[in-house]
């Protein structure tokens, strides 16, 4: 923290040519799929639901396999290309970006980072095609980033873990088949041990609550998820036993470039809409773009967007270059990006 890695910034991060070529194809596909759907997005937002038929279109266009390695049927995007893709998606609809992002940024990220070869062989091909959609199940009524307050518990019985508890505000909860779940598996000196598990929807005892009626992102699925004495095979334990807190933090840090990319896309869309209106709107015989306050507002929007894109690019380069400690930088990019979008 506090050290500027010159080799990351000079020269400025550049995407590999082969990945850039694939990215351009994906962006063209996103424009083709989403470019004429504005009326649909508005309707779905009012209804608070994304139709299953449209989710199937996302599958067909390969948007659930962005970060899955090519060996398992995905596109193998690194963080920079992934963030750029979510930037494009978010220009059209935030609920769609969140659905894809929750799947790739956090839902299955633990499998990519900590999964065994057997686990990857078992799940990644289905996650790449969207046959399985992923969700990240950490938050509870009294616990979120404070993972130590988790009440969901898992007790080992032979080759299985008996998992019980309730998770809250789980993005993709209503459509997910694959859950990365965090539970207490013991204590040491009053401090809880947390372990991560892969839980699938078809396991007896897994159920979801109704779709949450949210203020925004209404078409994305957000639900409670309930685990009632779910018997999870020991083979589905993700990473090491009692190392779940570190796993959760690693997932969240690694996935934050996706959120940053989405905010950039939203900001660019807002800037385009604002400048269009400023050019068209006239008062007292002249365009409002000529007023100093309007110039200042639009200028600040562009500055914030530029700075956000630079921060997200830097964090993506840290991740893609193999740096192990980028937690502070990832957190900064998330806070700055979300606040910049709010100001915009």
What are these regions (language model features)?
Residues 270-274, 304-314, 340, 344:
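Amphipathic, well-ordered alpha-helical segments in soluble domains
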Residues 207-306, 335:
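Glycine-rich beta->alpha junctions and the first turn(s) of the following alpha-helix
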Residues 1-101, 109-133, 142-145, 156-157, ...:
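Amphipathic, small/basic residue-rich leader segments at the start of a protein or domain
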Residues 42-45, 305-336:
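C-terminal helix-coil-helix/basic helical segment that borders enzyme active sites and/or dimer interfaces
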Residues 32, 62, 217, 324, ...:
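Alpha-helix capping/hinge segments and adjacent helical runs
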Residues 142-145, 169-172, 186-188, 214-221:
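Short Gly/Pro-enriched turn/cap motifs at secondary-structure boundaries
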Residues 146-164:
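Cytochrome P450 C-terminal beta-domain/meander region
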Residues 164-208:
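A short core secondary-structure module
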């Amino acid at each position: 923290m506090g050290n500027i890695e010159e080799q990351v910034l000079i020269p400025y991060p550049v995407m590999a040519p082969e990945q850039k070529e694939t990215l351009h194809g994906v962006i063209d596909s996103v424009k083709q799929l989403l470019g004429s759907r504005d009326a649909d997005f508005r309707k779905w937002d009012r209804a608070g639901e994304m139709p299953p038929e449209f989710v199937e279109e996302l599958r067909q266009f390969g948007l659930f396999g962005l970060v899955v390695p090519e060996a398992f049927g995905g596109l193998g995007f690194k963080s920079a290309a992934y963030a750029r893709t979510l930037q494009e998606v978010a220009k059209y609809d935030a609920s769609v970006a969140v659905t894809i992002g929750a799947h790739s940024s956090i839902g299955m990220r633990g499998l990519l980072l900590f999964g065994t070869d057997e686990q990857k062989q078992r799940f990644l091909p289905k996650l790449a095609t969207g046959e399985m959609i992923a969700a990240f199940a950490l938050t509870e009524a009294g616990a979120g980033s404070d993972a130590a307050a988790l009440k969901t518990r898992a007790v080992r019985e032979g080759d299985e873990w008996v998992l019980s508890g309730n998770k809250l505000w789980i993005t993709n909860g209503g459509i997910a088949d694959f859950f990365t779940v965090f539970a207490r598996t013991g204590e040491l000196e009053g401090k809880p041990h947390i372990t991560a598990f892969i839980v699938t929807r078809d396991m007896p005892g897994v159920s979801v609550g109704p779709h949450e009626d949210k203020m925004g992102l209404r078409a994305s699925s957000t639900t409670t998820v309930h685990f009632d004495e779910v018997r999870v095979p020991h083979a589905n334990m993700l990473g090491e036993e009692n190392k779940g807190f570190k796993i959760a933090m690693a997932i969240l840090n690694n996935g934050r470039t996706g959120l940053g990319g989405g905010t950039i896309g939203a900001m660019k869309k807002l800037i385009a809409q604002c400048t269009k209106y400023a050019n068209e709107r006239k008062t007292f015989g002249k365009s409002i773009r000529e007023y100093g306050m309007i110039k200042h507002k639009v200028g600040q929007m562009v500055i914030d967007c530029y700075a956000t894109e630079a921060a997200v690019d830097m964090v993506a380069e840290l991740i893609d270059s193999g740096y192990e400690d980028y937690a502070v930088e990832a957190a900064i990019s998330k806070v700055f990006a979300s606040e910049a979008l709010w100001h915009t």
